[in-house]
């Protein structure tokens, strides 16, 4: 909290002091060199008594940006007080004469013109308070007549105005042209500055440590042991921690809120340039049906390998291209593809990355594969169809690959092949039986019986295809 002290005895403005929430009133008194016998502390039109010296400032309602006023303790009229009163009267008369002179020299249109009230600094206006006047005063500043109605709001505004009159240093903190003349006129001060003061005070009174409305805070604190109140308090505390984390992240690591470009490389298939998406989270390398037709590989799709690609959603596998030459930079390498009806031309999956011992070097922004190095494409060259629709991005489940908009099945529009488990089995039919000799021969290669039977099911009993499947 930041506390400013206005000492009306010495006409000084101290602070603001940056204090912890657990500082006691006694420690605060010692900090400002407070004399209990001669002075009194006031905050929000309430005197801070010495009996509360063990309480913290927060318990006494002093939070955020606050002002504490030090006033002299009133004693019986003495010669000294009479002298001070005469000096104050002379000072007020002099100020009034000066204001009148300024008013005479100022055109009528400018006499009541003041800078916008919103310019009152937040550091001063939210919590500037003072003591209650010794007797009710009228808006004009004199004793109240019997038919005058003095509201607490009027008292608050008038007390603030008098604090500025008694503390020129405090008034100098308000960057309004002609403020010294403004505080001489109680009616004009109330009209222009009053609404801002009342609004700031209402904001301060509504604030609390839970960051919620004061009415809800009072309701929660009136019965904190109630299970529903405890749940709400816990929710508010958690929300405060979340907001704090958000603010820290935005201040110290704003880069985490930026979008990340996906990894694409250039390659060629049968002389056709292709932008391939590199996804180490995808189990298999995938080609779209459109690209298969463009590159002349559509006729080589083995539809016996039909199946379902399962991830966040699912999509239909059209078939498989067992081998095709792919050119990356100057290197030709054989590659196999799973063919899906998707809007992404080519996805370079983990099977090919592991096969050629690829290295995704994010520091150098390159892909090292098959003994060559190829750079990842800049953002401007990344296919635009990869970008998700903003409205869909908020509702779709997260996907680690771009295969989110598949046409094979309605569910496949949200499917992510990056986490997909590709089920290459053909549609369910009667359970097949395989030659025991083929099963034993494949098991001798180091695979379990279940893996061998699954591979034979995928290849429709072809032992050679099953062996190729097992070694992928």
UniProtKB/Swiss-Prot annotation:
Q: Region (Disordered) spans which residues?
A: 388-410
Q: Where is the composition biased (Polar residues)?
A: 393-404
Q: Which keywords does this Swiss-Prot/TrEMBL entry list?
A: Aspartyl protease, Cytoplasm, Hydrolase, Protease, Protein transport, Transport
Q: Where is the UBA domain?
A: 434-472
Q: What is its main location?
A: cytoplasm
Alphabetized PANTHER family for the sequence: ASPARTYL PROTEASE DDI-RELATED (PTHR12917), AT13091P (PTHR12917:SF1)
Return the similarity comment: Belongs to the DDI1 family.
Its name, as the record gives it, is DNA damage-inducible protein 1
Q: Which organism is it from?
A: Eremothecium gossypii (strain ATCC 10895 / CBS 109.51 / FGSC 9923 / NRRL Y-1056)
